[in-house]
Amino acid sequence: MSSSNDQHLRSLGPVTRRRFIVASGALLAAAGLAPRLGSSAQDATPAASPTAPLPTMPPEITEYANDWPTPQGNLKNQRAASNSSIDSSSVTSLDVAWTFPIKATSGYGGMTCTPIIAGDTVYVQDMLSNVFAIKRDTGELVWEADYNSSCEGPNGVALGYGMIYGSTGDAREVFALDAATGKEVWKTLLSGNTREGIDMAPNVYGGMVLISTVPGNSQAFYDGGARGTLFGLDAATGEILWQFATVDENLWGNPSINSGGGSWYPPAIDDDGNLYWDIANPAPFQPVEVDGTPITLGSTFDDALYTDCLVSLEPDGTLRWYYAANPHDIFDHDLQQSPVLATIDNNGSPYTVALSSGKLGKVIAVETTTGHMIWTAKVGEHTQWDDAQWIPPGQSVTVAPGVAGGVESPIAYADGTVYVPILNLPVTFNDKGLDASTLSFNDATGELTALDVMDGSVKWDVKLPAGNVSAATVSNDVVFAGALDGIVRAYSTNDGTLLWSYDTGVGLNAPFAVAGDLLVVPAAGAKLVSKSYAPEATPVATSDAGAALIGFKVSS
């Protein structure tokens, strides 16, 4: 069935900027907490009950818990395999078992998604929004669902309630496919604004599909009036149950110029069904004049909520709290990754934190009940201008992290350690904006950094010769990383020692997945050019070989 946007899209009023404490003053005073918090029950449309009651937990997430049943491995987004035979003693025996060619092409490669592994099947989506079900053991095609709609990525699919859920990128639709056959069950248009798109994999929980729009698509990004919005859809029918506006409809007084917000990666979900989303940046970044008069940009608006915020929502989409990680963002320093939920044992009193990260080059631990920041760790290269709120007239400054840099792909967590993939690519800004000629992915380097979840201190750090943009993926005492040089690398979780590597021959620009004795690597063939900032920028030098999904297995 199909759900029309006119029928289901509900209007939201301006985002409320009132700030108030979500716990009693006595409780916060006793704990010594003083977070920057905000909440309003009016920030989301009221939720309706799903048409057909579905179990809270999608059965597949429990049934395939030992595989890789969600985009980030589990609903806490920890990116750690739960029952894999791949460890430091077997990783050197990994060998290519099969390859599955991907024909789609884009400036970001043929794929940017994390594969889903569930039972006998691997599910992936290419950069034209097409979905493939592949036999886990042989790499043979089971079914294919074609949409041929461009996207910027990262995209991807989610599994639940007998269906595969995904989106059509530029077409701004969410769809549900029968997981066994690939036949479309429903499709819903999220936005009638052609300046917006969808560039993320959803998560599925509580009878809902959780997904977001972003302020752009493959044609252009950050055009005036483009906004990111979070959605909860009925997983059975596609009906929009609630939506949460991540930016004010009035866009800080200049809707013809400003844009921003939305999410690029799926939210984390706690045991109570609360949602944790990282929200992207405001725009534009360059000075703008209207009729000769400088205007206030979204990126220079001091309270440009909820951009660059960690936002926690109730299951029905109402706001619990937010943490503003990067107000007054003039460098596109998103807080755009999937938050990761982890437990800290504070002298026998454990509490949960959401680990947020993004292009600002920081990992931030935020307590999930109150929204109080516990610690912040800078990672990768930083210059003195990284937190600047203005650039002196006539000056040019080097900014690191750059507009494409910092934590560009998802982090992982296991056994008290946070694993952070890093892209180092400084750029030059002046008082007129970004100097696009300095954005060259050929000059990028990478790192993989291990942090102690207790306090954010560095346990170890290793350097990579190219940008590390394929996330971090943990299997027992091994952590995998992939870089733009096309090499898959496996490191010891203990000290960062390199254990194994494999040259795929193409740029790696998508996260891996691990299940049992299988490592699945999307060899995307990336030739990165950041069209959003600099169409003339130098692409990363990679092979002309096409993209492929590669299945590695431990050889006997």
Question: Could you tell me what each predicted segment is?
Answer:
Residues 1-16, 23-35, 40:
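N-terminal secretory signal peptides
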Residues 13-14, 35-65:
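C-terminal segment of N-terminal export signals and the immediately downstream linker at the start
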Residues 45, 234-237, 272-273, 346-350, ...:
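Secondary-structure transition into beta-strands, especially the periplasmic turns and strand N-termini
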Residues 50-107, 140-147, 183-192, 239-248, ...:
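Aromatic (tryptophan-biased) beta-strands that constitute blades/sheets of beta-rich domains
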Residues 65-75, 107-130, 149-174, 197-223, ...:
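Repeat-blade elements of multi-bladed beta-propeller folds
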Residues 89, 127-139:
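Beta-propeller domains
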Residues 133, 176, 232, 312, ...:
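Conserved blade-register residue in beta-propeller folds
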